[in-house]
């Protein structure tokens, strides 16, 4: 007897598997099965995290990942869960993870499929020791889609080994993206290109149930998230925007803003999807050689896909993130995403600054800021 609720499996069947074209139906059936695998990995991670310190997975793994960061035991364990859940059933050609330096090839004993999976198995792992909110992020591409000869142009050699270039495609080519947020409840937020939808894990029976259909981000907001400790390293357009927000009712925005920061991209983006806001991890001068802080393939791209599908915008400050062509597996970009009108404003400030047209503003830290200082001539 049906209870009228839509499970993740039913949603994927209704959305992907019932297409008039038999070829497309077959391809989408593979995508549905892959997303069910990802959901199974998320359930396992949720169960592991629920045990907390009792599970024996807290603390350092005594290893360093490809980014030079100390790995926690849970970073390693959650990465293994994703790999083991998704490698065996012939749906994937290869995987990329924040915790793995190079492309993970599907082992020879398993069949190879049509999709590529990029993921961050545990976003915000620095919050684990304080029992804070963490998450998982994932992105799905079709192997070789839009790249002509699969062996020559998608990073595959004649033996069928998938190389880095298979993944180095703009985020607009994603066929699915999502994240899990492990909070008081576990939620899976997903898009397959027909809007952004949220599913809540019903632990008693192990199903993800559709609870947030067709999420829409409000176009206007009075809330922003940024790590203010880096203010001295920000570019002037970001300092200008944040100062205007901090000035509140007495400033040019004539409105009071709230500032947030959780140190977990999943938690920040989830809040924006639920009630609006802007998330900023902008370019800065702290490490000049670094273009940004967040990884494009498995952080910025999937989150940007979800945000755009929900009516928001996502930019580097100067261009749409989903149009950026990756140059490396673990390449980074600045990220500014969220409510449409505020992201447009921040993008406009970057344009004005680059053209030398930015307006002066007063900052307690930086004093007056403008290219048009007294005595300045072009």
Curated annotation (Swiss-Prot):
Broad class of where this protein is predominantly found: cytoplasm
Residues annotated to bind substrate: 123-126, 227
Enzyme class, spelled out: hydrolase
UniProt GO MF annotations: fructose 1,6-bisphosphate 1-phosphatase activity; magnesium ion binding
HAMAP family: FBPase_class1
Keywords for this protein: Carbohydrate metabolism, Cytoplasm, Hydrolase, Magnesium, Metal-binding
Family matches, as CDD domains: FBPase
Gene3D superfamilies given in the database record: 3.40.190.80, Fructose-1,6-Bisphosphatase, subunit A, domain 1 (3.30.540.10)
Domain of life: Bacteria
Cellular component, GO annotation: cytosol
Pfam family, one: FBPase_C
Family label: Belongs to the FBPase class 1 family.
Pathway note: Carbohydrate biosynthesis; gluconeogenesis
NCBIfam families: PRK09293.1-3, PRK09293.1-4
Compartment annotation: Cytoplasm
Needed cofactors: Mg(2+)
Name recorded for this polypeptide: Fructose-1,6-bisphosphatase class 1 2
């Amino acid at each position: 007897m049906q209870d009228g609720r839509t499970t993740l499996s039913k949603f994927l069947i209704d959305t992907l598997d019932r297409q008039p074209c038999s070829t497309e139906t077959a391809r989408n059936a593979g995508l549905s099965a892959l997303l069910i695998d990802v959901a199974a990995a998320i359930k396992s991670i949720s169960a592991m995290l629920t045990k907390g310190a009792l599970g024996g997975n807290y603390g350092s793994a005594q290893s360093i990942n490809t980014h030079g960061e100390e790995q926690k035991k849970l970073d390693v364990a959650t990465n293994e869960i994703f790999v083991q859940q998704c490698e065996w059933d012939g749906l994937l050609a290869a995987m990329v993870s924040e915790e793995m330096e190079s492309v993970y090839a599907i082992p020879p004993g398993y069949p190879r499929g049509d999709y590529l999976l990029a993921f961050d198995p545990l976003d915000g792992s620095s919050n684990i020791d304080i029992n804070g909110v963490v998450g998982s992020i994932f992105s799905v591409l079709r192997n070789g889609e839009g790249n002509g000869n699969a062996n020559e142009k998608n990073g595959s050699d004649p033996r069928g080994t998938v190389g880095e270039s298979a993944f180095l495609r703009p985020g607009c080519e994603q066929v699915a993206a999502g994240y899990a947020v492990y909070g008081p409840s576990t939620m899976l937020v997903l898009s397959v290109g027909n809007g952004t939808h949220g599913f809540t894990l019903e632990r008693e029976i192990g199903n993800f149930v559709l609870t947030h259909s067709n999420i829409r981000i409000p176009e206007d907001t009075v809330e922003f998230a940024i790590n203010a400790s880096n203010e001295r390293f920000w570019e002037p357009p970001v300092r200008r925007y944040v100062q205007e927000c901090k000035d509140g009712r007495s400033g040019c925005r004539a409105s009071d803003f709230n500032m947030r920061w959780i140190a977990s991209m999943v938690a920040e983006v989830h809040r924006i999807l639920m009630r609006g806001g802007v998330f900023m991890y902008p370019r800065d001068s702290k490490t000049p050689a670094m273009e940004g802080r967040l990884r494009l393939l498995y952080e910025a791209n999937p989150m940007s896909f979800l945000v755009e599908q929900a009516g928001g915008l996502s930019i580097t400050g100067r261009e749409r993130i989903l149009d950026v062509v990756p140059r490396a597996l673990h390449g980074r970009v600045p990220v500014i995403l969220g409510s449409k009108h505020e992201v447009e404003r921040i993008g406009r400030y970057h344009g004005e600054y680059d053209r030398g047209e930015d307006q002066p503003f007063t900052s307690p830290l930086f004093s007056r800021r403008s290219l048009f200082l007294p005595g300045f001539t072009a």
